[in-house]
Amino acid sequence: MVIRVYIASSSGSVAVKKRQQAIVGFLEANRISFEEVDITMLEDQRLWMYQKIPDEKRPEKGNPLPPQIFNGEDYCGDYEDFFQSKETNTVFSFLRLPSVKDSES
């Protein structure tokens, strides 16, 4: 499975840009393989992302904002979920990846 981070390269929101950078930077720094999917350039990917986000993670109005994280077809979460996993040191579990300890044994 591959980690996919759905981003918006042309977002006018500074908060969205910072959140995207935080996730991408963390993944790069920890050498976690991932793909960036730009939903502003790929309409079919944007629609796919919207369809795969669980109802409980959708806003009352509008569409879910990037960044959104998937492992293959499995929804991992949004920035808030990612941030929480960083705080609790459970990023590998959040991303549905084997932990570093598991891969060393």
UniProtKB/Swiss-Prot annotation:
GO terms for cellular component: cytoplasm; nucleus. It is found in: Nucleus. A motif (SH3-binding) lies at residues 61-67. It comes from the Eukaryota. Keywords: Nucleus, SH3-binding. GO terms for molecular function: SH3 domain binding. Its main location: nucleus. CDD domains: GRX_SH3BGR. Belongs to the SH3BGR family. This is SH3 domain-binding glutamic acid-rich-like protein 2. It comes from Danio rerio (Zebrafish). The gene is sh3bgrl2.
